[in-house]
A protein has these predicted regions:
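Conserved HGGG/HGGXW glycine-rich cap/lid loop of the alpha/beta-hydrolase fold
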Residues: 5-44
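Short alpha-helix in the alpha/beta-hydrolase fold that links the catalytic acid
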Residues: 23-24, 172, 186-194
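Catalytic histidine-centered segment of alpha/beta-hydrolase-like enzymes
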Residues: 45-46, 207-220
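Gly/Ala-rich beta-loop-alpha elbow adjacent to hydrolase catalytic centers
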Residues: 67-71, 75
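Flexible "cap/lid" loop of the alpha/beta hydrolase fold
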Residues: 80, 85-116
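Conserved alpha/beta-hydrolase catalytic His-Asp/Glu region
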Residues: 118-168
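Short beta-strand/loop motif that positions the catalytic acidic residue
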Residues: 170, 176-178, 182
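Acidic catalytic loop of the alpha/beta-hydrolase fold
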Residues: 181-185, 209-210
Length: 229
């Protein structure tokens, strides 16, 4: 059955703007009611309070949530708050516990490293895109990072570094889009997320960590299939 009347909520990755969903949105059929939540529109800074603030917006309707990277824990918290109103979840290369040892380092690095230069472009192309798609794929990421609230960005990095493992289960159906090469989210983090889900399936999609940007066509298909389950 086509659940076209159910709202699909997209929660962005670390940049927090939602700008990087542009290609993905082009691939999701217009019959779906899709809303992108930008973290710049949210006052809250901790994972749990971000979820509480977002939950207020959607508490009277049934929703389907797509959470990219950083947003995994917000999605998890939303499932706990909204319960049966969340009809399903797709995680895009996401995590609900600390994704890797590198995430601790990320929170103390100067934000100047996120400005585009030869080194930062190369690092993002390597770690975010697995050196595929041509070096120009990193440009929109840097553009969105320049637009985001830098103080909030720093706090989001800190949130990732200090993530404790949650213990409550997610009851709704969960689909996890796992990039073929994710250099930022370790397999143990994915396994832990899977263990917290009552109904979990994994979809392996060709690409790097920025999977919605490097393979929007397949990601959109997985999302639409999950919504229609």
């Amino acid at each position: 059955a086509l659940h076209v009347h159910m709202k699909i909520i997209l929660l962005p990755g670390l940049d927090g703007t939602g700008i990087l969903f542009e290609k993905l949105l082009e691939e999701i059929p217009s019959v779906f009611d899709v809303e992108v939540v930008s973290y710049d529109s949210i006052k809250a800074v901790s994972y749990s309070s971000q979820a509480i603030e977002i939950a207020e917006r959607f508490k009277h309707e049934d929703i389907f949530i797509v959470g990219e990277s950083y947003s995994g824990r917000v999605v998890y918290e939303l499932c706990q708050i909204l319960g049966g109103h969340v009809k399903g979840v797709v995680f895009l290369a996401s995590f609900i516990s600390r994704p890797s040892a590198m995430s601790r380092v990320a929170s103390i690095m100067p934000l100047g490293l996120l400005k585009p230069n030869r080194l930062s472009r190369f690092m993002l192309y390597l770690f975010g895109f697995n050196m595929a798609g041509g070096p120009e794929v990193v440009a929109p990421v840097f553009q969105s990072l320049q637009k985001t609230d830098k103080r909030k960005l720093k706090l989001r990095l800190s949130n990732i570094a200090h993530l404790a493992k949650p213990t409550e289960k997610i009851d709704c159906p969960v689909t996890y889009i796992r990039p073929s090469t994710d250099l930022l989210v370790g397999i143990n983090s994915v396994k832990y997320l899977a263990s917290m889900c009552s109904n979990f399936s994994r979809a392996k999609v060709n690409g790097g960590h920025f999977i919605a940007q490097s393979n929007p066509v397949v990601c959109a298909k997985v999302i639409c299939n999950a919504v229609n389950m």
